[in-house]
Amino acid sequence: MRIARFSDGTNPVYGALEEGSTRIVGLKGDPLFSPVEPSGQIYELDEVRLLSPVIPRSKVVGIGNNYSDTPIPVDERPEPPIFLKANTSVIGPDDPIAIPAWSNDVVFEGELAIVIKSLAKNVSASDAPQVILGYTVANDVTARDAMTGGPWSRGKSFDTACPLGPWITVDPQLDVTNLAIRSYLNGEKAQDSS
């Protein structure tokens, strides 16, 4: 199932994209915190504005240095840097990114984002699947010159630095260890990784 958050010109709503279709079935409720059910409303994908599929209630937690050209066994990997993105950095997939005037080195990187379905803390690795709602795409926009000699959040947390979406893929059988991530800049492929 693919869950979208969108607006048809009124208040934002959640919906489920019908498989193999451009129709969205409206949902009542918030899939991140409560069970949902069909609202009876049907929307066409090309008639709505897609919003960020997630409204962060707290923060976006990022893990740095998560790509490698050489596979490294999990137990041999160094502790990765952790950084935060403010909830004001989150925007929808088609919203404009406001490049900060104070930076001369802004870059982007496509990322796989894990969507947590409820507030969670101190979750063990074995219990992690129980708190995962699904996955979406994130654009990790970074002002690299603001990170020099300081915390990563300085360069990663400015307003609009975290486009998400277009939807949350909910599939417990999804093998996230074997997904392709491609990013494009002005129609040209800029990233192709997994």
Feature map (PLM): residue ranges:
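Active-site microenvironments in enzyme catalytic cores
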Residues: 1-11, 16-193
